[in-house]
């Protein structure tokens, strides 16, 4: 074979080898880029899936009550023994909301129950409390609410019902006077949360000052777990 032809053949083989190497390198870079992109997308999706009411690393448990599956963060449970998954007859939670004086954070105890086990406070107002009201009326409470003490003869010693007299679906809460010096007055409010589910709220009487914000803030908070 002539020397010139051998040189051309050798040069062509070198070019082919160089092209092959470049193609392999490009394929490797594309593969690595794809892996990196997959990790980035997975991290972003995990961040997007994290509900806004809990931290990234906080575990949420699935509890079923009143026909609803709820995703509840561990930190919401009031009692450690309820931190298990599955069906429940009652779920006790404790939340913190800015419902105190001047919007200070206040603890709100929430007990979730099947709707059939309780009556809402608005129903008790006409069906029970109205018949136990004393003649006197308290005007020392929050603006917009009327306070009516309950007759102690029926077991309502030291209890007052605070309600909005102008609404067809009024805010109603029953509060009991402090049982000891230095203790706070405590209130209860029961509401229906839709088909199959109800909630009993327990809170300090100072929260009544933000009674107009109470239900909207509670519903927004509970919506985060699927209610």
Feature names for model-found ranges:
Residues 195-227:
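Surface-exposed amphipathic alpha-helical segments
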Residues 22-43:
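Hydrophobic membrane-insertion alpha-helices, especially the h-region
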Residues 103-191:
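Non-cytosolic head/periplasmic domains of membrane-anchored proteins
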Residues 42-61:
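Ser/Thr/Pro/Gly-rich low-complexity linker/stalk segments immediately outside membranes or between
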Residues 59-65, 162, 190-192:
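Short acidic-hydrophobic surface loop/beta-edge motif
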Residues 76, 177-179, 203-205:
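A mature extracytoplasmic/lumenal domain signature
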Residues 68-119:
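Extracytoplasmic/periplasmic/luminal assembly and interaction segments
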Residues 1-19:
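N-terminal Lys/Arg-rich, disordered targeting/topogenic segments
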């Amino acid at each position: 074979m002539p020397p010139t032809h051998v040189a051309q053949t050798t040069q062509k083989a070198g070019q082919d080898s160089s092209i092959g190497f470049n193609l392999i390198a490009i394929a490797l870079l594309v593969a690595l880029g794809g892996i990196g992109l997959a990790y980035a997308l997975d991290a972003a999706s995990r961040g997007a899936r994290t509900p806004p009411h809990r931290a990234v690393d906080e575990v949420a448990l699935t509890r079923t009550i009143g026909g609803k599956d709820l995703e509840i963060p561990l930190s919401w449970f009031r009692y450690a023994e309820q931190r298990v998954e599955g069906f429940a007859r009652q779920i006790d939670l404790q939340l913190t909301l800015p419902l105190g004086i001047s919007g200070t954070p206040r603890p709100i105890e929430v007990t979730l129950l099947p709707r059939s086990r309780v009556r809402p406070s608005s129903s008790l107002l006409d069906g029970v409390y109205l018949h136990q009201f004393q003649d006197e009326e308290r005007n020392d409470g929050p603006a917009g609410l009327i306070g009516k003490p309950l007759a102690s003869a029926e077991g309502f010693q030291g209890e007052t019902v605070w309600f909005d007299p102008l609404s067809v679906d009024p805010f109603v809460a029953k509060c009991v006077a402090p049982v000891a010096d230095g203790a706070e007055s405590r209130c209860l409010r029961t509401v229906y949360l839709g088909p199959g589910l109800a909630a009993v709220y327990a809170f300090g009487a100072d929260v009544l000052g933000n009674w107009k914000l109470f239900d909207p803030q509670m519903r927004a908070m509970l919506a985060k777990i699927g209610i």
